[in-house]
From Swiss-Prot:
Signal peptide (residue range): 1-18
Family statement: Belongs to the neurotoxin 03 (Tx2) family. 02 subfamily.
Name of the featured protein: U31-theraphotoxin-Cg1a
Domain of life: Eukaryota
Keyword annotations from UniProtKB, A to Z: Disulfide bond, Ion channel impairing toxin, Knottin, Secreted, Signal, Toxin
């Protein structure tokens, strides 16, 4: 019984590795063909410099509009109206404000601004 399980497992491993090798071979063939034709498969993303134009308190549409490492585009509700503006202060408490500025800086860093 154990021998049967070992044989079946080894056949499955051999089958999977053979299929993976075949898939890898076809990918290499496609890549070599594209290189011969002069087309590479490399895709490069480049982040352009941020074009921040808004200071804290001005209207904004996204985090990329606001200048400052911890300045984000947040919203304020006035009645039923929602206004978006650049803001960096998160709390009146000094400790909570420092933590909030750190969180804002991380969130601002994660907003990739591609233009």
């Amino acid at each position: 019984m154990k021998l049967c399980v070992i044989i079946i497992a080894s056949l499955m491993v051999a089958s999977v590795s053979g299929r993976l090798r075949k898939i890898k071979g076809t990918e290499l063939d496609k890549k070599m063909l594209l290189e011969k034709l002069g087309h590479g498969m490399d895709i490069r993303f480049e982040e352009t410099p941020r074009a921040c134009s808004k200071k804290a308190g001005e209207k904004c549409k996204s985090n990329c509009d606001c200048c400052g490492y911890s300045t984000l585009c947040g919203y304020i509700t006035e009645g039923k109206e929602v206004k978006y503006q650049c803001m960096s202060k998160t709390s009146n408490n000094k400790i909570l404000n420092t933590v909030g500025l750190g969180v804002n800086a991380i969130e601002n860093m994660l907003s990739f601004c591609f233009r």
